[in-house]
Amino acid sequence: MCGNNMSAPLPAIVPAARKATAAVIFLHGLGDTGHGWAEAFAGIRSAHIKYICPHAPVMPVTLNMNMAMPSWFDIIGLSPDSLEDETGIKQAAENVKALIDQEVKNGIPSNRIILGGFSQGGALSLYTALTTQQKLAGVTALSCWLPLRASFPQGPIGGVNRDISILQCHGDLDPLVPLMFGSLTAEKLKTLVNPANVTFRTYAGMMHSSCQQEMMDIKQFIDKLLPPVD
C-alpha cells in the first residue's frame, strides 16, 4: 500500500467565522504540509467558508532517490512522458473523495465545495474532480498538470462535473513544472469540460511558488463560486 491511506495527522483547518455553508479543500505540494496553505487561506478567508488543508502521508518518492517525504502518490519523473504511479494516484483520489463525503456529512453540499491544490496536490485535485461522481463547485489548480491524462476520453467527460469551473494558475518562470505543461493541461481540460469555464492565468516572474496577485485571483474565484447563502 506504500502508506497511501491518509495515515497522516488531521488536516490544518481555518474554520468559518460563522456557520460554515461552503468549504475549500486544498492539497499541498510534494514534501510540504497543509500548514502553510492554511495560513495563506486565513489571509483571504470569507466568513462562511471553511478551509481544509490535509497533510499527505509520508512515503518514499522515486523522483527524490526514494527519500521518504509527504507525498500524495509516488512521482517517478516530471516530464510529460514519465511513468506515473497509477495505483497511487487512484487511491489518493479515493481518499480525497472520502474527505469530500465527510464534509457532506457535516452538512456542506458537495456543490458548495471547491477542490484545489498546488503542484502534486493540484494534479490530484484535477484528477479527482474529473473522476468523481460528487458535483463540485470548482477547482483551483496551481502550478500543476493533469495526471494519467491518457486515461481521459478524447471528447468531453461524462458525469456531474462537465460544466465545472476551473482556475488554473502558473508562473511563467517555473523551473520544476514548466509553463508549457500548464498550458498543455489547460488545453486538455478545455476538451474535457465546458471550455468557457476554464481560466488559465500566468504570473510574470513567478517560479514554482505562489504570489500575492495569484492569491487575490484565487479569492475572487472562490468568493464568486461560493457566495454566502444567508
Swiss-Prot record:
Catalytic residues identified in the record: S119, D174, H208
Alphabetical UniProt keywords: Acetylation, Cell membrane, Cytoplasm, Endoplasmic reticulum, Fatty acid metabolism, Hydrolase, Lipid metabolism, Membrane, Nucleus
Catalytic reactions on record: S-hexadecanoyl-L-cysteinyl-[protein] + H2O = L-cysteinyl-[protein] + hexadecanoate + H(+); 1-hexadecanoyl-sn-glycero-3-phosphocholine + H2O = sn-glycerol 3-phosphocholine + hexadecanoate + H(+); a 1-(9Z-octadecenoyl)-2-acyl-sn-glycero-3-phosphocholine + H2O = a 2-acyl-sn-glycero-3-phosphocholine + (9Z)-octadecenoate + H(+)
Gene3D superfamilies: alpha/beta hydrolase (3.40.50.1820)
Stored InterPro entries: AB_hydrolase_fold, LYPA1-2/EST-like, PLipase/COase/thioEstase
Main localization category: cytoplasm
GO molecular function terms attached to this record: carboxylic ester hydrolase activity; lysophospholipase activity; palmitoyl-(protein) hydrolase activity; phospholipase activity
GO annotations of cellular component type: cytoplasm; endoplasmic reticulum; nuclear membrane; plasma membrane
Compartments (UniProt record): Cytoplasm; Cell membrane; Nucleus membrane; Endoplasmic reticulum
GO biological process, one term: fatty acid metabolic process
Positions carrying N6-acetyllysine: K224
Protein family (similarity comment): Belongs to the AB hydrolase superfamily. AB hydrolase 2 family.
Protein name: Acyl-protein thioesterase 1
Species annotation: Bos taurus
Phylogenetic lineage: Eukaryota, Metazoa, Chordata, Craniata, Vertebrata
